Amino acid sequence: MHFEVHGLDRPDAKTIILSSGLGGSGSYWAPQIEALATDFRIVTYDHRGTGRTGGDVPDTGGISAMADDVLEIAARLQLDRFDFMGHALGGLIGLDIALRRPELIGKLILINAWSKADPHSGRCFDIRIELLERSGVEAFVKAQPLFLYPAVWMSENAERMAADERHGVAHFQGKANVLKRIAALRAFDIDDRLSEIRTPTLVVGTRDDLLVPYTRSVRLAEGLSAAELALSDFGAHAVNVVEPEEFNNKVLRFLRARSEVR
């Protein structure tokens, strides 16, 4: 597993592990590193089958296998407790760890995640799969921003969109890996177990998310035993990239506050 450590390097520094979504790249969190670096040791990593970790996504195990990769990183860093922030699929990884190893996670942050995939999200993934299988990698990568960002933001960041597209094609994780990762997030379902998770959790959702209806975030906040809901009107699926200052402020307020488990 390829991972990087940023921010504080003191042995006693609080650690937060950041886990990205379907793309799997640790570089997704670039807009958060500086803001978190004054308070935390930050661990970012490339998911198995992606980026500098590479390799193949396991045929079995689903989200739990991806969570085991995080536990491997924690063991290598000798972490007995850490905070965890996950975007979409990364949030599912955090929920899995919170269920199986609750003693490890101090605080949990979920960004446009879910306890059970919404039918609308399934429709979006069907479209993306069809693009990949019928039109190829370039079409799949070209369509990806439509599910991540608001239209006005894409218009204002056209050069970035073009650069991201070139990078996405050049470093594509492979059709088999993408399909297995999509299958894992679609199969994830802990909806009837949410109340078992007592980890203090910040649930971040955006009303203009095209891929994941914000009602999935509402469901998480209602079902978890110690959750705070932070809804935004603007920012779409990748709200931490689109509105980093507002997002980072919410996250830091939550992480710095004393926990009150209800």
Swiss-Prot record:
One of its GO terms (molecular function) is hydrolase activity, acting on carbon-nitrogen (but not peptide) bonds, in linear amides. The keyword Hydrolase applies. It comes from the Bacteria. It catalyses: carbamate + 2 H(+) = NH4(+) + CO2. One of its GO terms (biological process) is nitrogen utilization. InterPro entries: AB_hydrolase, AB_hydrolase_1, AB_hydrolase_fold, Hydrolase_4, Pyrimidine_utilisation_RutD. Disulfide bonds: none annotated. It holds the Pfam family Hydrolase_4. Keywords: Hydrolase. Its EC number is 3.5.1.-. The keyword Chloroplast does not apply. PANTHER family: AB HYDROLASE-1 DOMAIN-CONTAINING PROTEIN (PTHR43433:SF10), HYDROLASE, ALPHA/BETA FOLD FAMILY PROTEIN (PTHR43433). Involved in pyrimidine catabolism. May facilitate the hydrolysis of carbamate, a reaction that can also occur spontaneously. Belongs to the AB hydrolase superfamily. Hydrolase RutD family. This is Putative carbamate hydrolase RutD. The lineage of its organism: Bacteria, Pseudomonadati, Pseudomonadota, Alphaproteobacteria, Hyphomicrobiales.
